[in-house]
Amino acid sequence: MIYAKIIQMIIRFWGTRGSVPVCSPSVLKYGGDTTCVELRSKNNDLIVIDAGTGIRDLAVSLKNEKCPESFTMMFTHSHTDHIWGFPFFFPVYRKGQKINISCCNAPCGSGKEIVSGTMRPPIFPVKFENAAADFSFSTIPPEGTEIYGIKVTPVAISHPDGGSGFRFEENGRIFVFLTDNELKYNHKDSIGFEGYAEFCRNADLLVHDAQYNDEEYKMFRTWGHSTYSQVLELAEAAEVRHVCFFHHSPDRTDAEIDTIADSCNALLRTSGKRLSCSAVYKKQEIRL
């Protein structure tokens, strides 16, 4: 598919699952692949966020259109479910392809350390140094930067080993991406619930980790993930327009996710809030 020049920010989701990829008839709607998000600027410039197993299907999509000669990849952190698709991303092996890896200074490592670590024997036969693409590496400063005309502001996530969330602003539209962020426990570098609410303030779209329900969270507190109710609380406090649940538990079926999203929307309707919510599904496209 050839995408015409667009006039708005577009977000496509290629991997929505958390922790580990899953495959069964019960997860076909929301998908079993791990985190990978495609972001397009108003001029159709490409930013890829994370390289979980969903990145392979993004590669297929890029093959079906004219893959940009140059694009940017960003990583939230270096846990395996967010990086292990990188060696299977065809542009890595495309001669003349320009890929900029842009990351924050974080305990999880530099951009080069993250991607090169996925391509080394004995865990993968092709060394990163032998990849055909032309790589460059840049650091996103704490105050943010501009990528393809999009203002990108990072924030430290509350997660074991650290990492970053991002706020993207273009043409007055705001998209905030906070995966693997534990709202009710302060890991090292966490800015706390109120800090995250301010970071998300007035976002048109907030996509946030909601791996657990309240009962599960009692067992997995400190593991670096949030619950549906906590994310709704954050979205209300931040006065966002729409919130999407993300990083679905590998044990969660489509039917269970549907039930959670429906019950959360019913709760919002009775409260009279302008906020709406949904659960992100694989290959979903959102335009801002």
Where are these regions (language model features)?
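Residues immediately flanking
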Residues: A51, N181, A210
